[in-house]
C-alpha cells in the first residue's frame, strides 16, 4: 500500500540468494522481486553494485580506487561493483559464483581464488 501510495521503493541489493551452511537461501533481491511483481514498481538499489555506494565507501575510508581491491563471492554484484568503481577485483569461490559460472559474464575479475585464505600471503606486513 505504501509504494502504491507513492512511497519510494528502496532495497539494499539485487542478490536473489545468499549462501548459508544449509545451501543458498532467498535474499534481498528475491523479496524485492516479490514486491515489484505485486506493485509494478522497480526498486532503487542502494547497495552493491550501485557505484554511489562504492564511492561513498572509498570516501569514508579515505581510499582510492587505484589502491583498493574489491573482494567478493558474486560476479553480478561484488565484482561488477568493484570494476565500475575502477578497482581491481577478486572473486572468492566459497560463495554464490562458482568457477564454471564465470564465463557467463561479459567481464572478468582481476583474480579468482578458492578461498579468502589464499590472499593472506599477499597482505603487506603490519
What residues fall within each predicted segment?
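Asp-based, Mg2+/Mn2+-dependent phosphohydrolase catalytic module
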Residues: 1-126
Amino acid at each position: 500500500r505504501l509504494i502504491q501510495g507513492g512511497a519510494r521503493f528502496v532495497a539494499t541489493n539485487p542478490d536473489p540468494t545468499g549462501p548459508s551452511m544449509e545451501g543458498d537461501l532467498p535474499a534481498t533481491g528475491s523479496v524485492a522481486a516479490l514486491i515489484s511483481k505485486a506493485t509494478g514498481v522497480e526498486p532503487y538499489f542502494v547497495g552493491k553494485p550501485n557505484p554511489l555506494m562504492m564511492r561513498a565507501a572509498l570516501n569514508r575510508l579515505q581510499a582510492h580506487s587505484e589502491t583498493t581491491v574489491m573482494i567478493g563471492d558474486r560476479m553480478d554484484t561484488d565484482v561488477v561493483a568493484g570494476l565500475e568503481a575502477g578497482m581491481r577485483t577478486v572473486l572468492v569461490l566459497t560463495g554464490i559464483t562458482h568457477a564454471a559460472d564465470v564465463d557467463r559474464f561479459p567481464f572478468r575479475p582481476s583474480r579468482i581464488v578458492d578461498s579468502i585464505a589464499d590472499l593472506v600471503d599477499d597482505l603487506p606486513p603490519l
